[in-house]
Amino acid sequence: MQNNRYRLRYLPLFYDDLNQKLLYISDVLHNIAAANKLLDSVESAIKERQFMAEAFEPYESLCERQHPYYRIYVGNFVVFYVVIDEGEAGKVMEVRRFLYNKQDVEQKIW
């Protein structure tokens, strides 16, 4: 059986988004357990999607993009990623943003 796993790449902006949310939960809300649980859930969701990154409906953006965005819902948050075909090197699942689901997404992923 062929391994169809996409290579993973994370943008620094994703890490900034994630760290901001985790610090808020752990330091402001004083809930370290919830922050750790969120981190584990995000990591698991991304790893699960790595095998089928293009099997889900693309996000309908208001502007045309070279690579369509896909979403992974994790509780009240959304992970945004794109798939980039790098030819013989294979396909990359590039994880770009981690946003609260009530944020103005179009403004954040522009």
What are these regions (language model features)?
Residues M1-S41:
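Arg/Lys-rich, positively charged N-terminal/basic patches that mediate binding to nucleic acids
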Residues N4, R65-P68, A89:
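Residue-level preference for short coil/turn positions at secondary-structure junctions
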Residues L13, V42-R49, I72-F80:
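A short, hydrophobic secondary-structure junction motif
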Residues L22, E43, R96-L99:
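Conserved protein kinase catalytic domain
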Residues H30, K47, F51-A55, F77, ...:
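Generic structural signal for secondary-structure transition and capping sites
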Residues A34-L38, E57-E60, E64-R65, E86:
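Solvent-exposed interaction patches of small proteins and small membrane subunits
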Residues I46-I72:
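A short, surface-exposed loop/turn module that caps and links secondary-structure elements
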Residues Y70, V74-W110:
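Enriched for short, Lys/Arg-rich terminal
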